[in-house]
Amino acid sequence: LAAYQRKERAGLLIMATGTGKTRTAIALVDVLMKANVVQKALFLADRTSLVNQAHNAFKANLKDASFVNLLEDKNQVGRVYFSTYQTMMGLIDEMNADGTRKFGTGMFDLIIVDEAHRSVYQKFGEIFKYFDSLLVGLTATPRDEVDRDTYALFGLESGVPTDYYDLDQAI
């Protein structure tokens, strides 16, 4: 939240495995929605299993929002959407019957990128360029092992994430 208050539009959170990346994402969406900063959010992951896990966790912990799993229903309307990169790449080109885009550039106020360390940016980076939104990446990869292109995507100096929470802090 401090990064957002400094008018930064992107951030990378590095958290050790099992320390609550998804719970952190849920809390972030909750706070930003309650503050009316975010109306619609998109949670992206590289695998169907991660999308489904996140969808279920959000439903269980964020009672006041409506959810759309785009892997199951591409026509539903809600406040928090879940998708794989591959599915979203196809959807940003889809048109409505009236000729407008199904997902316009301003559709989402916040995009959360799970497993942000993966090499998805060369292939799916257009998603992040297309949407005009806040961008938050989550990864468990130690900060000295995160690719510098990942830091660059979030507008950060190599090796300097927005925040990190390592296993020593968790214990």
Where does each model-flagged region fall?
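RecA-like P-loop NTPase motor core of helicase/translocase proteins
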Residues: 1-171
